[in-house]
Amino acid sequence: MGNRKRLIFAVFTLFVILLSGSGSSYNYFPMDKSIPLVTFIFDDGNDTDYIVAKDIFDAHGDVACSAITTDWINTKNHLNVSQLTELQNNGWEILSHTVSHPNLKTLPESQVETELAQSKATLEGLGLTVKNLAYPYNKNNYTIREVAKKYYRAGRSGHNMLNPPTILDQYDLKAYSSNHPLSKLEGHVDKAYSEKKWLILYHHRIEVKIKISGKTGNFIPGENLTFNPSGATGKYISDKNFVAYGSAMHLVPISGTPQANDIITGQTSGAACNLDRVDYNQEKALIELIEYIHTKYPDMRIVTIDKGLDIYL
């Protein structure tokens, strides 16, 4: 009986060795797909991917994805080639987000093909590796997905759903907008972890919105701002007065955290105003969400789209 067991074991061992040398792609020891995942994607190629988000992910040992509309590369408030290259060299994934950011569902198939093929070719011509796509406005249909299959491994849409590993629709990957209170985003993380699914969150430009008063002069778009006494700095985007709300300012956070009662000064215009309150700070919320994931679910993985596909497919 002992000899028979040894013979069976020897035959099995030989079988495995032959398979491993045959080039067979079948995974006889499959990866555990019941791993909860989170992916962060920043759409449009805003410069805040580099000047804000990169430092946040670096500090936590994580990476994210930047979805690039190629017509906007090297334009105001968007990433330049050097920044894109550094992001990818740092482990970020660069996704295509088409050439001109159209609603693909409004285009004939020939134009869809142009948008998807040329954007990939342009990015690759810059020396970047591009395997996956984010649909502008999350819009896609059967025809668009069939075109995407010619050029990409996967495509991300919206739908406000999680992605199950067992029935992954790789050309219609589900995602949630990050434009919600932190508590709601934490709820998405909780659900993904408990159900062992893949949560994809998409973002745009990282901004701070504040209520201001006592404005003197006019701020210049893109100028640097200082906040005293907090010592924070930022980049001015816009401000507008609302009848019921009062005046609101949008800015890109650069350093520090703006505080109520700060005096804001434009470094080029000399304009100034009072900071009454911070309505939302997307930089702070992003940091807190990443720390929530690492603290509460240390075995939950933050991955790029391509890495998530490696795990789930």
Can you name each region flagged by the protein language model?
Residues D44-I51, T75-E86, K284:
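Aromatic- and glycine-enriched glycan-recognition loops and surfaces
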Residues N27-I51:
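Boundary/entry segment of secreted carbohydrate-active catalytic domains
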Residues I35-V38, D58-A154, G158-L173, K196-E207:
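Metal-dependent polysaccharide deacetylase catalytic core of the NodB/CE4 family, i.e.
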Residues E207-R277:
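Autoprocessing Asn-cyclization modules and mimics
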